[in-house]
Amino acid sequence: MNGQRRGHPPKPAQLDDVSKKIIEQLQADGRRSYAEIGKAVGLSEAAVRQRVQKLTDSGVMQVVAVTDPMQLGFFRQAMIGIRASADTRVLAEQLAAIDAVDYVVLTAGTFDILAEVVCEDDDELLELLNSKIRNLEGVLSTETFVYLKLHKQFYNWGTR
């Protein structure tokens, strides 16, 4: 387990101010050039490239394209709370294998697992719930929270 003791979280990465500024630059515009970032943070283009490579290789950050589901024809998003009678880790893996599921987290509280789904419409959501999710062995019950309007979605917690 990467040298960590069972049950203990990994040590958080120690980022210096320059690395944090590089991350902030990429969060503002993931296509910003290394030369532009270098000017903003006081490093050469090569130094920025090396730092970005180190940050991505270590898993501290990733640079990805984020799409708008509605622009792609997926008009129904929902969070599904799942109560389980089976090993939640196994159930989470099964949920993660479903194409319409884009987020799975084990939780403490009312639900054992939360899974976010993205569907074209309500009919697809209903089919997903009835034919796939509720049919998984160990699912006791589900509660679906349909999204009406997204008010905030940011990915900038990494430099606080």
PLM regions and their residue ranges:
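A compositional/biophysical signature of low hydrophobicity enriched in polar/charged and small residues
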Residues: 1-160
